[in-house]
Each structure stands twice: as C-alpha cells, then as structure tokens.
Amino acid sequence: MTTENQDALSEIASAATLADLEAIRVRTLGKSGTITALLKTLGAMTPDQRQAEGPKIHALREAVTAAIADRKASLEGAALEARLATETLDMSLPVSAGMQGSVHPVAQVMDELAEIFADLGFAVATGPEIEDDWHNFTALNIPETHPARAMHDTFYFPDREDGKKMLLRTHTSPVQIRTMMTEKPPIRIIAPGRTYRSDSDATHTPMFHQVEGLVIDRGIHMGHLKWTLETFVKAFFERDDIVLRLRPSFFPFTEPSAEVDVGFTWEKGRRVIGGDPAAGNGGWMEILGSGMVHPRVIANCGLDPDEWQGFAFGCGIDRLAMLKYGMDDLRAFFDGDLRWLRHYGFAALDVPTLSGGVGA
C-alpha cells in the first residue's frame, strides 16, 4: 500500500497539464479506478482484515484526493499567470460610449415651472385625471349648455349606475377646486399635468400638458396677477425685456377675465419671445388665459367670496416648450422618435435652477 501511495502521489506531482491530472483522477478515483477497486474489496474481508486494511485504503484515498486538489490549484495558478503575462490593457484607449437616455422637453419644462413658482411661494398640487362632471365643469361655473361639455370636445366614460358622469379632465382646474375644498386659505398652488380634449392637428393633440396657477387670499387684485405673470414669463424665457398685454376676455370661472399676450420679435425667420412688439419686426402672441376667480366658484368650494379673493391662470406646457426651444409640430412630442428626443432632450443632470438658469 505504501508503494501504491508513493507511486500515485509521484504521478500526480509530475502531471504537466490539467488534462493529465484529470486522467490520473479517473484512473485512481473513478468508478473503475485502482483506489475505488481497493475500497470495494473491504466488503469481502473478515472483520480483522477490514480493521487492519480499511484505514490504510481510506488514508490512500484522502492523500490522493488532497494531492490532486493541490496540483490542480497549482496548474490553474500557473495558467492564469501565463495568460496575464500575454495580455495588456491600454488605459489610453477611449471608452466605448454607453447608451444614455434623455429628459423629455415636457418633463424639463415642468421642472422649470416648479422651480420658478417655488421661488414665488407656490406649491405643486396634483389630482385625478379621471374626473367627475361636478369638479370639471359645474363647480367652475361652466353651464350645461357650454360647448366644452359636448361629446365632440370631451372624452366621457359610460354613465355610472349612480348617474354621476365621469370623464377625462379637460383642464387641471379641478385640482384648484379640490385644493380650495380641502385646504384653508391663503392658497398658492400650480397644478401641472395631463389633460384631454378631442382635437388633433399640428398645434393640438388629444392629450396635452397644462399648468394652472391659483392664488386665494384677502385683498387680491389684478395687479397681483399681472406682476406674477410678468415675473414668471421673464424667468421662464430668461429675458428682462418681456412685455405683456392683457386683453379683456371671457371664461366662466373668472371675472374679470383676460387673455395674456407676450411681445415677440422676428430673428432669422423665427419668432423669439421678448423685445419691442411695436418695432417693425415685432408683434404679439397669446400665451395664456387668466382672471380673477369668479365669486361663484369660490362659494362653490365653501369659502366666503366677500372675505376671500383670488386669481387664476393657465397655459399649455407643450406650447411653452415649443416657444422656448423651437419645436414646430406638437405631434412630434408624442411620436417617440429617438432622433427627435436626442436632439431636443436634456441630460439627466441638467436640473433647472434659478441660480444657474432654468433653461441651462
């Protein structure tokens, strides 16, 4: 047994490759191996013989197993050293560019709006996109005969058993209603989000993004509204030469109401917000609607209109993005074209800040 042990260990130590070592393992410890055959003889031995020979055979198997493991580790280590000696890594080579996503212009503009109005003391409020008829129309002083309630302009859901009409909200004004009903004045919020109307062309889509603002407090008047809008538009377009014009208009939920125009100039064939609209290359462009919150709307929310007044405004986020960043077709916003997104998208770390410029 001692001779067999020495021969096996010597053969293992002299194995030059992993393949040679595996052949030795199979020849000694495999199903038909020499040591396996010795283990099988234990069953035919007498108890005295088994007691004398068993420990020797088991010791031989353990010694061979350990020697094979040690030699395998040695050969693998040598192979690794040899491979590393032939491989080099050129640290001066440029790294392959990884795939990067981009922030959609609508999401970027939403962040810009939140940053600007947060500096003015406004909070961001949200609400459900599936609304009931009362929050979307009735509470906002929109009569049953108003065209906005028509099926061709609003997406309605099938009638419910309780008779309540459900629809996809046509504006984010219901967020204002819910806020006035659940929070105590004074209130300063903006309500950005998705809205839905049955319309589709180069400047309209069935789903679009809108932001509305609401201020409720004592002694609020049109001067507060005009200052807020001027401050917002100047910060958003990052120009101090912004000129606004308020034109009398009509909205059921505000009284008085005003359409807000902004002055622009033509530069290289494109309209650029800012500058003197009275100049030969200038003009006016409507960008949002606004007005003092109608007393009936305030009363519908459980507040006393004799004590509380407020103003509201609203505009399309997609339209703001088009005016600021030069997109021509609103439908491209939702086509999912990677070329368009790479061109107009923003880097993930390009976070809007007032100190660095909201459009930086």
UniProtKB/Swiss-Prot annotation:
- How would you summarize the oligomeric state and partners of this protein? Tetramer of two alpha and two beta subunits.
UniProt-recorded name of the protein: Phenylalanine--tRNA ligase alpha subunit
EC numbers listed for it are 6.1.1.20
Reactions this protein catalyses:
tRNA(Phe) + L-phenylalanine + ATP = L-phenylalanyl-tRNA(Phe) + AMP + diphosphate + H(+)
Question: Which GO cellular component terms are attached?
Answer: cytoplasm
Localization recorded for this chain is: Cytoplasm
* Cofactor(s) essential for the protein: Mg(2+)
- Say which family it is in: Belongs to the class-II aminoacyl-tRNA synthetase family. Phe-tRNA synthetase alpha subunit type 1 subfamily.
- Positions in coiled-coil regions: none
Q: Where does the UniProt entry say this protein principally localizes?
A: cytoplasm
This entry's comment on the bound cofactor is: Binds 2 magnesium ions per tetramer.
| Gene Ontology biological process terms from the UniProt entry | phenylalanyl-tRNA aminoacylation
Question: What organism does this protein naturally occur in?
Answer: Rhizorhabdus wittichii (strain DSM 6014 / CCUG 31198 / JCM 15750 / NBRC 105917 / EY 4224 / RW1) (Sphingomonas wittichii)
Tell me the residue numbers annotated for binding Mg(2+). Answer: E255
UniProt xrefs under Pfam families: Phe_tRNA-synt_N (PF02912), tRNA-synt_2d (PF01409)
Q: Which Gene3D superfamilies match?
A: Bira Bifunctional Protein, Domain 2 (3.30.930.10)
Sorted keywords for this record are: Aminoacyl-tRNA synthetase, ATP-binding, Cytoplasm, Ligase, Magnesium, Metal-binding, Nucleotide-binding, Protein biosynthesis
- Class in the EC hierarchy, top level: ligase
InterPro entries, alphabetized: aa-tRNA-synth_II, aa-tRNA-synth_II/BPL/LPL, Phe-tRNA-synth_IIc_asu, Phe-tRNA_ligase_II_N, Phe_tRNA_ligase_alpha1_bac, Phenylalanyl-tRNA_Synthase, tRNA-bd_arm
Q: Which GO terms describe its molecular function?
A: ATP binding; magnesium ion binding; phenylalanine-tRNA ligase activity; tRNA binding
Alphabetized PANTHER family for the sequence: PHENYLALANINE--TRNA LIGASE, MITOCHONDRIAL, PHENYLALANYL-TRNA SYNTHETASE
